[in-house]
Design a protein with these regions (language model features):
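Secondary-structure boundary/capping positions in well-ordered alpha/beta enzyme cores
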Residues: 38-41, 82, 172
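Short, glycine/charged-rich beta-strand-loop motifs at protein surfaces that mediate ligand recognition
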Residues: 23, 151-154, 179-185
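A generic structural-conservation signal
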Residues: 42-44, 100, 174
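Mid-domain catalytic core of redox enzymes
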Residues: 47-164, 168
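Flavin (FAD/FMN) cofactor-binding core of flavoprotein oxidoreductases
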Residues: 160-193
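Helical element adjacent to the flavin cofactor pocket in flavoenzyme catalytic cores
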Residues: 3-65, 69
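Residue-level signal for pocket-adjacent positions within structured domains
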Residues: 14-16, 41, 86-89, 109-111, ...
Length: 193
């Protein structure tokens, strides 16, 4: 998957048809391997990114490359010295679907992802994270159970989450949840220009 992305190899089947997940530390393993021998600053609140002298200046330190992992709408406000104003109107108009991700414990099963369109509940997908790596389950998950993330489109209250979980198979037990309003940009004919 990483090779295909770097070398622009087109997927010949559906988007998740090729899948790799490391047994220890999950997808974090990939990030850690890519980060080896690089100077990476994590957990830093960046208020300004300036392009000067063919380098990126951030918090009084110069960098050759910057990977922006924030909301693209914020990028327009904080980047200086690199003209992205021609895209500003389109970026401001960009719409998103948010996702409420619910961390749960569920019955052990053989699946990685379960897409579950149903009129019985509002969830659209279960990601069986406990099946990707045993270390994802930790020592607290009882025998016959695994961890999972159950996703709901847009924001949903804890009360509604609990109510929905009671109608989903695999007997999900609520552990925690987090809402991200900027999960999926809504594409249109102009957003890929």
């Amino acid at each position: 998957m990483v090779y295909n992305n770097i070398n622009h190899v087109k997927e010949k089947s559906f988007v998740h048809s090729t899948f790799w997940y490391e047994n220890m530390n999950g997808s974090q393993y990939i990030a850690d391997k890519l980060a080896e021998e690089l100077h990476i600053c994590y957990d830093t609140d960046i208020k300004n990114i300036k392009y000067a002298h063919n380098k990126w200046l951030i918090e009084e330190e110069y960098f050759d490359k910057v990977i922006f992992c924030g909301n693209i709408k914020d990028m327009v406000k904080i980047v200086e010295g690199f003209d992205i104003r021609e895209y500003e109107d389109e970026i401001v108009k960009l719409e998103y679907h948010g996702t409420t991700a619910v961390f749960c414990e569920i019955d052990k099963n053989p699946y990685s992802w379960i897409y579950q369109p149903s009129k019985q509940h509002e969830s659209h997908r279960i990601i069986c994270t406990g099946n990707f790596a045993k270390s994802n389950n930790g020592n607290c998950v009882p025998e016959g159970r695994i961890t999972a993330t159950i996703e709901f489109t847009d924001e949903i209250s804890k009360e509604d989450i609990i109510d929905n979980l009671s109608r989903i198979s695999l007997h999900p037990k609520y552990l925690a949840h987090k809402y991200n309003p900027y999960t999926y940009p809504i594409q249109n004919v102009h957003t890929r220009d």
